[in-house]
Amino acid sequence: MIERGKFRSLTLINWNGFFARTFDLDELVTTLSGGNGAGKSTTMAAFVTALIPDLTLLHFRNTTEAGATSGSRDKGLHGKLKAGVCYSMLDTINSRHQRVVVGVRLQQVAGRDRKVDIKPFAIQGLPMSVQPTQLVTETLNERQARVLPLNELKDKLEAMEGVQFKQFNSITDYHSLMFDLGIIARRLRSASDRSKFYRLIEASLYGGISSAITRSLRDYLLPENSGVRKAFQDMEAALRENRMTLEAIRVTQSDRDLFKHLISEATNYVAADYMRHANERRVHLDKALEFRRELHTSRQQLAAEQYKHVDMARELAEHNGAEGDLEADYQAASDHLNLVQTALRQQEKIERYEADLDELQIRLEEQNEVVAEAIERQEENEARAEAAELEVDELKSQLADYQQALDVQQTRAIQYNQAIAALNRAKELCHLPDLTADSAAEWLETFQAKELEATEKMLSLEQKMSMAQTAHSQFEQAYQLVVAINGPLARNEAWDVARELLREGVDQRHLAEQVQPLRMRLSELEQRLREQQEAERLLADFCKRQGKNFDIDELEALHQELEARIASLSDSVSNAREERMALRQEQEQLQSRIQSLMQRAPVWLAAQNSLNQLSEQCGEEFTSSQDVTEYLQQLLEREREAIVERDEVGARKNAVDEEIERLSQPGGSEDQRLNALAERFGGVLLSEIYDDVSLEDAPYFSALYGPSRHAIVVPDLSQVTEHLDGLTDCPEDLYLIEGDPQSFDDSVFSVDELEKAVVVKIADRQWRYSRFPEVPLFGRAARESRIESLHAEREVLSERFATLSFDVQKTQRLHQAFSRFIGSHLAVVFESDPEAEIRQLNSRRVELERALSNHENDNQQQRIQFEQAKEGVTALNRILPRLNLLADDSLADRVDEIRERLDEAQEAARFVQQFGNQLAKLEPIVSVLQSDPEQFEQLKEDYAYSQQMQRDARQQAFALTEVVQRRAHFSYSDSAEMLSGNSDLNEKLRERLEQAEAERTRAREALRGHAAQLSQYNQVLASLKSSYDTKKELLNDLQRELQDIGVCADSGAEERARIRRDELHAQLSNNRSRRNQLEKALTFCEAEMDNLTRKLRKLERDYFEMREQVVTAKAGWCAVMRMVKDNGVERRLHRRELAYLSADDLRSMSDKALGALRLAVADNEHLRDVLRMSEDPKRPERKIQFFVAAYQHLRERIRQDIIRTDDPVEAIEQMEIELSRLTEELTSREQKLVISSRSVANIIRKTIQREQNRIRMLNQGLQNVSFGQVNSVRLNVNVRETHAMLLDVLSEQHEQHQDLFNSNRLTFSEALAKLYQRLNPQIDMGQRTPQTIGEELLDYRNYLEMEVEVNRGSDGWLRAESGALSTGEAIGTGMSILVMVVQSWEDESRRLRGKDISPCRLLFLDEAARLDARSIATLFELCERLQMQLIIAAPENISPEKGTTYKLVRKVFQNTEHVHVVGLRGFAPQLPETLPGTDEAPSQAS
């Protein structure tokens, strides 16, 4: 079961006496107990303000001025607030267990008006742990707190996750949220709804029976049913529109003949004049255009001649300028040839000198070799002389040393002395002072090893020395060669530079070998380049003459084209005469054909207009007569189909109307006889009992009762038996069920519910299986849903029926139009367009005339073209052989490349010529540069040192060997003293000395002779070097002179220079010849221009005269055209068939129409004046003004609510169709209105019965309510007798009063009011209009009378009035009425709110001390039974046993007024429990 929403607490912030107070509200009764001024009313006022924050309604009477005669500015709220921000908040929990805090922010507005500013807000998603006071206050310290403004509260809540804060700008939005969330019972859409809610709360607050509520119980308890009123208002509007439309159609129909006549004559009058002016303008324009064409042609010829003159003058100027350039180029070419010849002679001298230098170079090299050999012989002689000197010196020393004796003693003495001397020498040489003869053998081995090592080292150095001696002279020679080639450089760089020079020499020799091939290639390419330049010049000249640039790929095709053109031009010139004759013959044939077509054109145009109208009407395109006849057959078939479909739709619409009428019966009875039987049997229809069943439950109950769903429920079946005897006026099957209609339930059957079906056990041996119907009709909601769908279907069917009716009539009229068309125009309409053919023939005629007039010019142009083509072919014959050259874009680049390569090769040749011999000499000896020759002296010193070391080692070893060999001689010490004399050895030494001296003399003489010869060789070498240097210097001077000349003096240079000179001479001759030709042509062109200028002046004079005539009429014609286009009448006036009539015929036609129009507009002053003004022939635009005025007059007469078009012609065509269709629609709606007069009575009666049942159910909840002597309270609902009579007449006797409902002057509401007056003539209606009375009669609430009755003591049921009841009884009775109103609102709003929400119920009761304990207990019981919360205020002597009681005591503490609150929950035997958070210490807002 859905739990009902509850108010959890009320929070007051900064109210008078309450700074921050939260009252937890009991689920039933919350009592505010306290003395006067304790704050009970303030608390209730805060609750009401949060519930209804509408300052226009809030009025707390117990705080306003008593006895005041004028309205109080303070309605009780301003004085209950303290300065600053105030809050009143309601904490609620709804049926969905959602916590919602709603409230208002209040603030006093400064001023004498004592106004209060109110801002409502709502908070959703707030956790249960957060108290309302925590939200709106901020604790500053233990004794102080601050109230947060609304914007800070918003920021604080937005920072909390899941919490939503909403501020409302309107009370309607605030109450809408409260209704959707189940806080209030009714949706308060307007100020009137809020006023009712406030009056309810106010009546609850102050107690008693509220006259404001009891007087308007119908507004509180009965919901407004505006459906009937709105339906009949819509019906009245539709009927009013239909009647106005019908009247407008009749008026339009009466004007139809006038429309036709006025349109026809106005069109003839204006269109004839319009087309006549158009024809005249076309003729004048044709003449002007012809003159302009001739003028344009002459101007073109003159412009062509001028262009030709300018072109030839420019070409002549170009040739004059080119002649000077060519003369300068020719002179430069001649000078260049002379320079080339001079350079060639200079080159021959250079070659002779180079040959001489080569010869001197060879002789110089040979002399160098001779000098080198002489130097070698000189060195040999010096060595020999030096050796002879050494030998003489050695022999002399030997002769002095060896003079011993020849005997043994002398020998032993000598050997002993020699041994001693050898030992001493060995000591000295070996630096061994302790050396003895015995130890000499040991030391000998050591020094022999040293000697061997020194010898090996000396031999190695000797080998190096030998090689170094050989490389020494080569290095110097190679170094000098490198210096000669490269210039001065360091000796250590010679090797790297030499290798680089050799590599460069190889490259330079390779390049030098290419000089001659490159010269030949360059000569060839330069020749091709000159030819290419010449070809480009020829091509540029050709393109300039042709007036178009050509690609070289197009030249061959152009050549063929020009040759073909030459052939074709030669043929065309020969065929010109025959062509001229053929053109004249064709021109005559065209003239006769055009005349015949102009006679046929008007008939064809009339047929086409008729065909276009038919095509527009049917939306089809017809291309043949067969298409027309086939479409006519389709129209017939379509008409039959549309009639059949219209009849079917009409039948279905009638069936829907019948079903709607049947379902609209009160109580859901589909048979009127059942209502009468129910009243006769004293029962109630079962469908009425279940009239309030929901749409979801309708299928179940419909299947549950099955065929008995139309049964009658009677209290006692036995009492019905006598009525059944002889009953005939009843349905075929009549079901009767015994039961209490006031407390009927579905327990009469045993039911098993299946899926979408039920099994009903009617008896032990009889079951019924019924499925849920797809379209249930059981219950008001189901019937209303079905009626709504049927109404929608009926609207669709009505619209479809009207559309089909219109289509049928339109098809019939279209069929008639097709029949007329077939009879009148079918024979000619599908022939070819004569106007199109005329245009083609006229175009061809103009072409023929132009061809004939320009034939001679064409022949002349062809001859000119022939000459130009021949000239072009001649030029192309010179260009085509050079196409390859023109296509070679890289030729100039290749010439530059070859020239650069030739320059490099020539430079290389000069390098080779200058340094070739040095490089050749350097190449075989370059390897000697790897080692520095300056190391030779060091090597020489090393060799000398090694040699000395080897000699020293050898001497040491020899000395030790000698000591070892002479070990035996040391024993000849006794012979040492012996002397020896001379011997033969001395003689031999002397002989050898003489021979050595003689050899020395010979060597010295030879040395002197070779020295003189070497001096001669050096003199010859110096002479050769001087001659070589002189020749070399002369060669360098010649080469510089050749470079200064700046001409490449190769073998073909002279030939190229001569060819270039001859070519320039030929170009100069051609240029002079062309210049002479241009001078002659220019003279002839000037004469032709003079002739064209004279002809042009005459043509301009003729053209301007004709143009002046056209311009004179243009202003009026432009005004006419602008007026025609702006008013969209061109289609009406531009009748092409009139274009073939003569000006006299058109003028006659216009005059006849003018006479008819004068009679037609005689009664219309405006059109008559406009027609009179349009007769001026000089102002054709005034005729258009008349036509526009006539159309505007007709357009204003068209009712736009009937015919949706601005075209009067179309309006005439639609009148008949629209008239019949709308007449039928009006008839249908009137028939519907007759049916609706019965339906409205049924709906009102059904609604009354439903509300009576609902009030009856409400009364059941108040049966046990008692207050004092009042035992029960109930509501009586009765139908007024006058209104019940009206319902009877509407449902049963409406045919007797059809004069009211069929009247075109009365609406349905007015007819209903007249009927009411007719039935109740005694009632005075006052000043109210019938329309107002009729609208009131459509509201079912005006049919009912409601009053509250109480069952009081022995008096029984009495009308509840305050004068007849005690105060407590009045309070209890009033509270009962309010509870009934709240419950009624909930029932009414249940369909508007979610089904899972049961709204909060809360009422107030101030000054409850006027009730006794029994009444208080009754209130508690009522609250518990209805799940209602109640807040009551009572003095301190009231102590209820249930609910929650708050004791309020107002105190003053330190000039601060506050209310002390203590909360108690009931009075049980246990000790009272103080509610948490109710004891409040005084606090002051910061």
From Swiss-Prot:
One Pfam family hit: MukB_hinge
Single GO MF annotation: DNA binding
One cellular-component annotation, GO: nucleoid
Subcellular locations according to the entry: Cytoplasm, Nucleoid
Domain of life: Bacteria
Keyword field contains Nucleotide-binding: yes
Binding site for ATP: 34-41
Cell wall biogenesis/degradation among keywords: no
Gene Ontology biological process terms, A to Z: cell division; chromosome condensation; chromosome segregation; DNA replication
InterPro entries in the record: MukB (IPR012090), MukB/SMC (IPR050308), MukB_hinge (IPR032520), MukB_hinge_sf (IPR042501), MukB_N_dom (IPR007406), P-loop_NTPase (IPR027417)
Keywords on record: ATP-binding, Cell cycle, Cell division, Chromosome partition, Coiled coil, Cytoplasm, DNA condensation, DNA-binding, Nucleotide-binding
Coiled coil: 326-418, 444-480, 509-603, 835-923, 977-1115, 1209-1266
Residue numbers spanned by region Flexible hinge: 666-783
Subunit structure, interactors included: Homodimerization via its hinge domain. Binds to DNA via its C-terminal region. Interacts, and probably forms a ternary complex, with MukE and MukF via its C-terminal region. The complex formation is stimulated by calcium or magnesium. Interacts with tubulin-related protein FtsZ.
Role summary: Plays a central role in chromosome condensation, segregation and cell cycle progression. Functions as a homodimer, which is essential for chromosome partition. Involved in negative DNA supercoiling in vivo, and by this means organize and compact chromosomes. May achieve or facilitate chromosome segregation by condensation DNA from both sides of a centrally located replisome during cell division.
Entry note about domains: The hinge domain, which separates the large intramolecular coiled coil regions, allows the homodimerization, forming a V-shaped homodimer.
Family to which this protein belongs: Belongs to the SMC family. MukB subfamily.
Name this protein carries in UniProt: Chromosome partition protein MukB
Gene: mukB
